[in-house]
């Protein structure tokens, strides 16, 4: 996976990295050699070695110059496509399934405040259909006032046997159709709909923060 490149050390690049360089045979400056004997190819091979050395130098410098921002971008791409670990759901009377991976360390969100969350959203078969990580910023939403689907409100704010989330918490939600978009398709544009009717939705929620300066209303 792309994430694994973040753990490589400089020694690995210099000792075990073996790049493959391809030379086009269609170019007039091609290094392809069609000859009847090895001696006819020696001058071209020496040129190839010099070019290979220069190319390897550029390649090594570009790899070793991986910045923290590059690493963050790779992590964002990783979390946009890979879900949190599996856990066993508990179920509220409403039918909402919930499971805490991390209870969190901060405050609970009062009804009506703005909160920032990161999330990935999947269908019941595991197919990803939305993720805040792909946009590289959390979603800002007003909690508990009907601005989002009922399953998200209840899953974050709590109620009916669901404990409220705390800042820093990570929770998995299994949202039945009646707490999501119901029997009608959703996310439709020009006749194409992202979410079919009667879809059960799976959310991985990361409660980032209560929006600074947010007030209930």
Curated annotation (Swiss-Prot):
UniProt KW Transit peptide keyword: yes
EC number: 5.2.1.8
Catalytic activity from the UniProt record: [protein]-peptidylproline (omega=180) = [protein]-peptidylproline (omega=0)
Subcellular localization, as worded in the UniProt entry: Plastid, Chloroplast thylakoid lumen
Span of chain positions assigned to the transit peptide in the UniProt entry: 1-34
Protein name: Photosynthetic NDH subunit of lumenal location 4, chloroplastic
Database matches in PROSITE patterns: FKBP_PPIASE
Domain PPIase FKBP-type: 112-211
Keywords, ordered alphabetically: Chloroplast, Disulfide bond, Isomerase, Plastid, Rotamase, Thylakoid, Transit peptide, Transport
Family designation: Belongs to the FKBP-type PPIase family.
InterPro entries: PNSL4/FKBP13-like (IPR044183), PPIase_dom_sf (IPR046357), PPIase_FKBP_dom (IPR001179)
Gene name of the encoded protein: PNSL4
Species this chain originates from: Arabidopsis thaliana (Mouse-ear cress)
Consequence of gene loss (knockout): RNAi mutant displays impaired NDH activity.
Record note on quaternary structure: Part of the chloroplast NDH complex, composed of a mixture of chloroplast and nucleus encoded subunits. Component of the NDH lumenal subcomplex, at least composed of PnsL1, PnsL2, PnsL3, PnsL4 and PnsL5.
Origin organism lineage: Eukaryota, Viridiplantae, Streptophyta, Embryophyta, Tracheophyta
């Amino acid at each position: 996976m792309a994430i694994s490149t973040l753990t490589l050390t400089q020694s690995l690049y210099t000792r075990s990295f073996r790049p493959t360089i391809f030379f086009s045979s269609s170019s007039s400056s091609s290094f392809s050699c069609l000859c009847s004997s090895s001696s006819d190819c020696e001058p071209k091979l020496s040129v190839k070695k010099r070019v290979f050395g220069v190319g390897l130098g550029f390649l090594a410098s570009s790899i070793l110059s991986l910045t923290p921002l590059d690493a963050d971008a790779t992590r964002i791409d990783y979390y946009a496509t890979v879900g949190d670990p599996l856990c066993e759901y508990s179920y509220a009377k409403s039918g909402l399934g919930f499971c805490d991976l991390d209870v969190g360390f901060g405050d609970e969100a009062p009804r009506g405040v703005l909160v920032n969350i990161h999330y990935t959203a999947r269908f019941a078969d595991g197919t990803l259909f939305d993720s805040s990580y792909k946009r590289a910023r959390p979603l800002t939403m007003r909690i508990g006032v009907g601005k989002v689907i009922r399953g998200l409100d209840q899953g974050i704010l709590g109620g009916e046997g669901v404990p409220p989330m705390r800042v820093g918490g990570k929770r998995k939600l299994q949202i039945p159709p009646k707490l999501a978009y119901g029997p009608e398709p959703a996310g439709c544009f020009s006749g194409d709909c992202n979410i079919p009717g009667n879809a059960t939705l799976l959310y991985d929620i990361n409660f980032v923060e209560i929006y600074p300066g947010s007030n209930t209303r």
